[in-house]
């Protein structure tokens, strides 16, 4: 009986297959194939997880509408122009992107370190830029769904009227604003990792000031030129101002600067933040190799 089992196993598993030196090696991706594979693999959990847990329909859509409703009723109480209602709805939708960058991108490497995954990322042949890009694309997909839900519901509830002047410019503004914003998130993710436990406090500290200086609920033109110019380092500031100029009739009269200039600034911010994120990642990896640990507190 045992001889029959042995001969059967020999027929199913050849000795050559058990030897690591024999036969063809398992093909492994490298270069751009590995880069794309890493991006897809890292974005997959965020995209699929969005469909498996539908509780976000309540927590990430209906609850943010409450703050939108507050500003809408304030504007209606003071008899503000109707376009201000649309400003609030669009701004409330864009908050979702800032929250995703703040908590889903900037703090992500710190949480990966706490869970023990960061060392695996660094030891793997995959590029850290590809890992962060995958997180950004996955987060962008899920956040876009939430923002669309807020815009649709807010527009229906408050009868917001849109007058798009240029779809091409609107797409360019949104695309460049997202590239710059998530580039900022990729850059600050390395910074947060170096700061270690202070990352949580920085995220809490950065949340409300950006609400103010990005002009989520009002035109930033009211700040005056110099404050608006300094606030423009935040990609959402320029992105929101340009989108409002393109989708509302009174937008151009309430805009900070012209849309073509804002598009140029967003393109420049995209390059700066993406390049800075690459430098920060290179420094983080060098620190890990030199000191034998992923991060340390700088005091």
For each feature predicted by the language model, list its residue ranges:
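Hydrophobic transmembrane alpha-helices and immediately adjacent juxtamembrane helices
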Residues: 2-299
């Amino acid at each position: 009986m045992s001889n029959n089992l042995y001969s059967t196993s020999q027929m199913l598993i050849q000795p050559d297959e058990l030897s690591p030196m024999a036969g063809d090696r398992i093909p492994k991706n490298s270069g751009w194939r590995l880069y794309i594979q890493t991006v897809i693999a890292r974005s997959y959990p965020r995209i699929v997880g969005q469909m498996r847990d539908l509780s976000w329909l309540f927590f990430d859509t209906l609850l943010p509408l409450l703050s939108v409703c507050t500003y809408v009723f304030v504007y209606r109480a003071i008899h503000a122009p109707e376009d201000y209602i649309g400003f609030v709805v669009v701004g409330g939708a864009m908050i979702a992107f800032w929250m995703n960058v703040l908590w889903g991108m900037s703090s992500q490497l710190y949480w990966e370190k706490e869970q023990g995954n960061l060392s695996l990322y660094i030891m793997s042949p995959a590029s850290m830029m590809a890992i962060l890009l995958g997180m950004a694309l996955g987060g962008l997909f899920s956040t876009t769904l939430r923002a669309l839900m807020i815009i649709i519901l807010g527009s229906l509830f408050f009868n917001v009227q849109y007058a798009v002047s240029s779809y091409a410019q609107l797409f360019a503004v949104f695309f460049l604003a997202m590239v710059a914003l998530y580039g900022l998130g990729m850059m600050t993710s390395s910074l947060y990792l170096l700061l270690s436990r202070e990352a949580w406090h920085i995220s809490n500290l950065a949340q409300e000031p950006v609400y103010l200086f990005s002009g989520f609920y009002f035109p930033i033109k009211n700040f005056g030129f110099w404050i608006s110019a300094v606030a423009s380092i935040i990609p959402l500031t320029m992105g929101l101002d340009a989108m409002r100029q393109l989708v509302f009739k009174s937008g151009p009269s309430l805009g900070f600067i012209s849309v073509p200039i804002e598009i140029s600034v967003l393109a420049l911010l995209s390059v700066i933040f993406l390049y800075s994120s690459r430098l920060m990642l290179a420094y983080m990896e060098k620190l890990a190799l030199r000191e034998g640990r992923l991060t340390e507190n700088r005091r």
